Swiss-Prot record:
Keywords: ANK repeat, Cell membrane, Coiled coil, Glycoprotein, Ion channel, Ion transport, Membrane, Repeat, Sensory transduction, Transmembrane, Transmembrane helix, Transport. Residues 1149-1191 form a coiled coil. Residues 833-870, 916-932, 997-1004, 1026-1048 are extracellular. Expressed in many sensory neurons, including OLQ and IL1 neurons. PROSITE patterns: ANK_REP_REGION, ANK_REPEAT. Residues 1-811, 892-894, 954-975, 1070-1193 are cytoplasmic. One of its GO terms (cellular component) is non-motile cilium. This is Transient receptor potential cation channel subfamily A member 1 homolog. Residues 1005-1025 dip into the membrane without crossing it. It is found in: Cell membrane. Receptor-activated non-selective cation channel involved in the nose-touch response and foraging behavior. Contributes to the neural responses of sensory neurons to touch, particularly after repeated mechanical stimulation. Has no apparent role in thermosensory or chemosensory behaviors. ANK repeats lie at residues 49-79, 83-112, 116-169, 173-202, 206-235, 239-270, 277-306, 311-340, 344-374, 378-407, 411-440, 473-502, 506-535, 540-569, 573-602, 605-634, 638-669. The lineage of its organism: Eukaryota, Metazoa, Ecdysozoa, Nematoda, Chromadorea. It comes from Caenorhabditis elegans.
């Protein structure tokens, strides 16, 4: 048998199977079951049979069989079946007293509970008849007699209780046997339980007592028996219902009367009790439509101090609404006011008429004929209320009773108007037919005696027919039904002379209202009646097509267009239906209008539909109109394109839709204008370009634009490929100067390119800010760095611009300045190194005092070597040049120069260097020894000079990141410094007090310094605590003195050298980690700062020459890939140290990326090869196991004479 025929796909471990298993035999081997197992099975089967016999015998009352079975299995007397029922449960369930006695004599447990928690006492109380009684009892009288005088139940209950059965056990629902007896009307059980002192006021889960359950489910005898047993009639269930609530709702006057006779006082009190639905027994009787019960309660209410009319509100309204006529009459006869007002000031007649309760309406009108036209707070009469629900019978009756048909409500609506609004077709038709008949009768009577007065009345009735009477807003019934689309009602009104051209206060016709509501059928019907309705406009000049388009009703729009509606009609805002649809964002309607020939744009309109769609952020509409060929770069009155509007209103998806078009470059052209003063200096204004807006709001879209600014001439694999970078939007420093619009001055405009055909600056190009620090601060590259947009800074276009600026100007200027500064600082160091300190000059006998050179003009013959005059000249020359450069920068950058602390350090270094090398006395000139204050100044100058070199190196991409780490650590330390100082002050003050005799702690100023030094490990423990006791400066004064000093020293070692120093190290590590995580961002940000600062320093020459700036830059990526030998090594060396002459930002990292990519791909291929090998091995193992499994299955099938036939199926 092949593995395909088996069709098995399983994973089994077959090693554990025994190939020669002797326990597996065929039928021929004649294997037999164990005799011990057969005996065990037979015993278990016999026990189960005995338990079944015991349960069955107890159920059937077969005492002999039960006794015989119990003799064989006495322990099965309490056996439970699947429902946890014992034989005692079944015997009690079917009223088998003899079986109950036998079971109890055999030690049956009377308190055992079944699955529902019922004991045998529960079961005996719950079920009334025995098993044999059910078939024998036929008539109802016999059933009542059996229920009342069932002696078996009493005997069973007494027997159970005599054997210590609990009298009030509760099941899982907290029901006692007495609850069951009351619920099932088991009188015998109830009587027996009460006699045995069962709790008549026990409560179940719903706080229902037996009396409450009896009122719901029981009989009069049960209730009477419970009342005799002093059951509490004031108990309330979980819904706060009393027995009076329940019997009132059920409508049992006998029960109610019985409880009233039992305790009249409590009955009266119960009338004032509310349940959780805020209902009294009186209200429940009304809601249950039980007039007899209601009359009993009303009789009791006469004795109640709290009158039911004051307590109960709108009872008559409820009865009138439901049509409970007898209940209504009973309430009225008991003193109820049938003209009572509810919360909306309506009388019961309103409610009855509304719900079409004709009998109630008739009764109320017959009693009070003057109330036929009574109104509620909305001014609605009973006739109007009947019309709202199309209660035709009541309408006919009220009209027959002379109800006023011309009366109006507070909104001046007639019954016909209200019926039209609620589409009460039959009622309105009846009213209109009635009015037509009445008008004809009036006409005939008037024509018989044609006086001037009667003729005037007839003509006025004709003119003001009911179907054309308007409401407060001048809407006719036709307006309302048209807006709701009630076609049959429209036809009915039109049949009776309704006007379709009448307008409301907004000058809207019924067609306008139908168009607003999108009622296509109503629109079609109105146009069939009068096509001229298309020409009518509302007070805002909107046609029906305008209104349908604004609401986005596509089908209605189609009907209007098919009937010849004007597609180019303009409303008071000079908007066409298409523009209105765009305002509302209705794409389907726009498509419908365009498909029908609506004009998308006009040459006279500055604002197109795209501007509107972009303002509201309707991306789908924008894309649709772009596909239709709308001009996307048209500008409105403010010079903004639709793209500008989308960006201003933060509609990112709309902006993306514009940028995905072929005309994206036209959208990126700025339209900002910066005025010039009389000196041709721009006023202080920020540039507002589309690209800057994208940088601020949508960086992802800015990256998309930057991608489009890179053009490649050929495929990536072509070695002759060239890449062109367009910097026009990224480097927007320059604008074109032209005459202002009013001709009185000049201005800078952004809509015209500042570059010529050769991509160089035009003659009239000018920076948009005279202070180039503003250009530096708000340059797009700087904005990217400040916002930490690494993906934008790392974009090839940004890197290309940085590389271009660095190679053309930044690199030569930076390295030239760095070289000159190195020459200066090295010369200053050499000069100081070869100059003797004023306190270190030897006079053949001793050293001179340093003040000697400050006080004497001439020097004695001293043996010292003067520094070479070359160093002095170099220092003076470079310092003077640098000071002039700083003055020039101050002139150019003005206040911005002063706020930069690096400029102050430069000025300090160069000025102090000049002062240091200057000879202020003849002694200094002849000996070269500086005066004391000069020497101190030289120390500060040399320190800040080298530190300044550190900050200059910080701007180098390769090494600057480490300086950034150091600066971040210093900043963190100074944030921690207040805590650090407090520890220093605490320990130094204590050491000053306890070790004041020692020189290092002798003053309050030296002690902090020594304490700080001790933090780095210079403790001098032996010198402090084990010095010469004979010397005052090393002596410890007594044991207490020594103990305090040791304790302080111990805490100092723990806190300052271990805890505090480790804390500082941890903070430093975190700072370094943070810088490393943003290393690429920091590097690019520093490069941006360096390049832009150099431009800011030299912008005067840049703008004069106009040769440096460009908007387009092309490279050949594969131009240097063929360099080998020394040329390749030299190129790599220059690239590593930022000296590469390459102008392509991608080439500098190409080798590294290729190496990383190759290494990564190699590793992935190796991992995949290993995985494939592992998979192949697993497949081989699975195949072997499957073959073995097939062999085993085949042997088993052969041994068991099983024929296996499997069909082959294609996977």
């Amino acid at each position: 048998m092949s593995k395909k025929s088996l069709g098995l796909d399983v994973r089994l471990e077959l090693e554990g199977l025994i190939s020669n298993d002797d326990t597996i035999r065929s039928e021929k081997d004649g294997r037999q079951a164990s005799i011990f197992r057969v005996a065990e099975l037979d015993a278990r089967t016999e026990a189960d049979n005995l338990r079944s016999i015991i349960h069955q015998s107890a159920r059937e009352g077969n005492v002999n069989a039960l006794q015989e079975a119990l003799l064989k299995a006495p322990l099965a007397v309490n056996a439970q079946d699947g429902d946890f029922m014992t034989p005692l449960h079944y015997a009690a369930r079917y009223g088998n007293y003899d079986a109950v006695k036998l079971l109890l004599s055999k030690n049956a447990l009377p308190n055992t509970k079944n699955r529902e928690g019922d004991t045998p006492l529960h079961i005996a109380s719950k079920y009334i008849y025995g098993y044999s009684d059910i078939c024998s009892i036929i008539d109802e009288d016999q059933a009542d007699s059996a229920r009342k005088y069932n002696t078996a139940t009493k005997k069973i209950i007494n027997a159970l209780v005599s054997e210590n059965a609990e009298i009030d056990p509760v099941n899982k629902y907290q029901l006692t046997p007495l609850h069951y007896a009351a619920m099932k009307s088991n009188f015998s059980a109830l009587h027996a339980l009460i006699k045995l002192k069962a709790d008549v006021d026990a409560e179940d889960d719903n706080k229902m007592t037996p009396l409450l359950l009896a009122c719901v489910h029981g009989s009069q005898e049960i209730i009477q028996e419970l009342i005799k047993a002093n059951s509490n009639v004031t108990k309330r269930d979980q819904r706060l219902n009393t027995v009076f609530h329940i019997v009132a709702l059920r409508g049992e006057p006998e029960y109610l009367e019985m409880m009233m006779d039992h305790d009249p006082v409590e009955a009266i009190k119960a009338l004032n009790l509310f349940n959780n639905e805020k209902k009294t027994p009186l209200r429940m009787a009304v809601e249950g439509n039980h007039p007899e019960t209601l009359k009993k309660i009303l009789q009791m209410e006469k004795k109640n101090s709290c009158k039911w009319m004051d307590r109960e509100k709108e009872l008559i309204h409820f009865a009138a609404e439901k049509g409970f006529l007898e209940v209504l009459k009973a309430l009225v006869e008991a003193g109820g006011n049938k003209n009572e007002l509810n919360e909306v000031k309506a009388v019961p007649l309103h409610v009855a008429a509304q719900m079409n309760q004709l009998e109630v309406v008739s009764y109320l009108i017959e009693e009070e004929k003057d109330n036929i036209d009574v109104v509620d707070e909305q001014g609605l009469t009973p006739l109007m209320m009947a019309v709202t629900h199309d209660s035709k019978k009541c309408v006919e009756y009220l009209i027959a009773k002379k109800a006023n048909l011309t009366i109006t409500d507070k909104d001046e609506r007639t019954p016909v108007f209200i019926g039209a609004k609620f589409n009460a077709l039959s009622s309105v038709e009846y009213i209109l037919d009635h009015l037509r008949k009445k008008n004809k009768e009036t006409e005939r009577s008037a024509l018989k005696s044609p006086t001037r007065n009667t003729l005037r009345i007839v003509s006025e009735d004709v003119r003001r027919t009911m179907v054309n009477m308007v409401d407060r807003d001048q809407n006719t019934p036709m307006h309302i039904v048209a807006s709701n689309g009630y076609l049959e009602m429209m036809q009915l009104l039109q049949k009776h002379g309704a006007s379709i051209t009448q307008v409301n206060e907004d000058e809207e016709t019924a067609l306008h209202r139908a168009a607003i509501g999108g009622q296509t059928g109503a629109v079609r019907q109105l146009l069939e009646w009068d096509i001229r309705l298309l020409l009518m406009k509302d007070e805002m000049g909107n046609s029906a097509l305008h209104l349908a388009a604004r609401s986005g009703h596509d089908a209605t729009t189609k009907v209007l267009l098919d009937n010849g509606a004007d597609k180019e009609a303009k409303n008071s805002y000079q908007k066409t239906p298409l523009q209105v649809a765009v305002d509302s964002g209705k794409l389907e309607t726009c498509q419908r209008l365009v498909a029908k020939g609506a004009q998308i744009e006009s040459s006279s309109d500055t604002k197109t539909v795209l501007h509107t769609a972009a303002f509201y952020g309707n991306e789908s509409i924008v894309r649709y109109f772009i596909a239709e060929g709308v001009t996307i770069d048209r500008r409105d009155e403010e010079g903004k394109t639709a793209f500008d509007i989308a960006c201003e209103n933060d509609h990112k998806d709309v902006a993306r839709a514009f940028l995905e078009t072929d005309q994206w470059k036209n959208l990126m052209i700025p339209c900002d204008v910066i005025p010039l003063d009389k000196h041709r200096n721009p006023v202080n204004m920020k540039r507002r370009t589309p690209f800057r807006t994208l940088l601020t709001k949508f960086p992802e879209l800015a990256s998309f634009v930057m991608d489009n600014c890179i053009e490649k001439s050929k495929e990536e694999t072509d070695s002759t490929q060239s890449v062109a970078y367009n910097f026009e939007f990224l480097d927007d420093t320059y604008m074109m100067r032209c005459v202002s619009d009013d001709g009185t001055g000049e201005q800078l405009i952004g809509c015209k390119s500042a570059y010529d055909e050769d991509f160089k600056l035009e003659k009239d190009a000018q920076s948009y800010a005279s202070n180039y620090d503003r250009v530096y601060k708000y340059h797009p590259l700087k904005l990217m760095a400040d916002a930490e947009k690494l993906h934008l800074l790392n974009h090839p276009l940004s890197k290309a611009l940085l590389k271009y600026k660095w190679n053309r100007l930044g690199r030569p200027m930076y390295y030239f300045a760095l070289f000159m500064y190195l020459v200066f600082i090295v010369s200053l160091t050499q000069y100081v190194r070869h100059t003797k300190a004023p306190y270190n000059v030897w006079n053949e006998e001793s050293y001179y005092d340093s003040e000697y050179f400050d006080e004497n003009e001439t020097c004695p013959q001293i043996n010292t070597t003067k520094p070479d005059v070359v160093w002095k000249i170099i220092i003076q020359t470079l310092a003077v040049c640098q000071i002039l450069v700083e003055c020039f920068q101050l002139f150019q950058r003005k206040f911005a120069y002063l706020v930069n602390w690096e400029n102050w350090i430069d000025c300090f270094i160069y000025s102090t260097a000049l002062i240091t090398v200057y000879d202020f006395s003849e002694c200094s000139a002849t000996s070269g020894v500086r005066q004391n204050w000069q020497w101190i100044l030289a120390a500060l100058c040399i320190f800040f000079g080298w530190i300044n070199l550190l900050f200059m190196i910080r701007k180098m991409p390769r090494f600057g990141i480490f300086v950034v780490m150091f600066v971040d650590i210093v900043k963190t330390f100074f944030r921690f410094f207040p805590v650090f100082v407090l520890f220093i002050i605490a320990f130094s003050s204590s050491f000053y007090v306890i070790l004041q005799n020692r020189p290092e702690f002798s003053t309050i100023f030296m002690s902090p310094l020594k304490t700080t030094v001790m933090m780095i490990g210079e403790f001098e423990f032996t010198g402090i605590f084990h010095g010469d006791e004979t010397t005052h400066a090393e002596k410890m004064f007594g044991p207490a003195h020594t103990a305090v000093a040791c304790a302080l020293f111990f805490f100092f070692c723990i806190i300052m050298t271990i805890l505090l120093m480790n804390l500082l190290v941890g903070l430093a590590v975190d700072d370094i980690k943070g810088v490393q995580e943003k290393a690429e961002l920091k590097r690019l940000a520093m490069q941006v700062d360096l390049v832009l600062q150099i431009e800011a320093s030299l912008h005067f020459f840049i703008q004069r020459t106009k040769k440096y700036a460009t908007c387009r830059y092309a490279t050949f990526p594969y131009g240097k890939l063929h360099k080998t030998g020394f040329a390749g090594w030299w190129s790599n060396f220059r690239r590593r140290f930022g000296l590469s002459v390459s102008t392509d930002p991608e080439i500098d990292e190409m080798y590294e990326r290729e190496a990383e990519f190759t290494s990564e791909m190699t590793q992935k291929l190796q991992n995949q090869a290993a995985k494939l090998k592992n998979i192949q091995e697993n497949i081989d193992v699975m195949y072997e196991k499957q073959v073995r499994l097939e062999a085993i299955i085949a042997k088993l099938a052969t041994g068991l004479n099983i024929n296996i036939e499997l069909e082959e199926k294609d996977n």
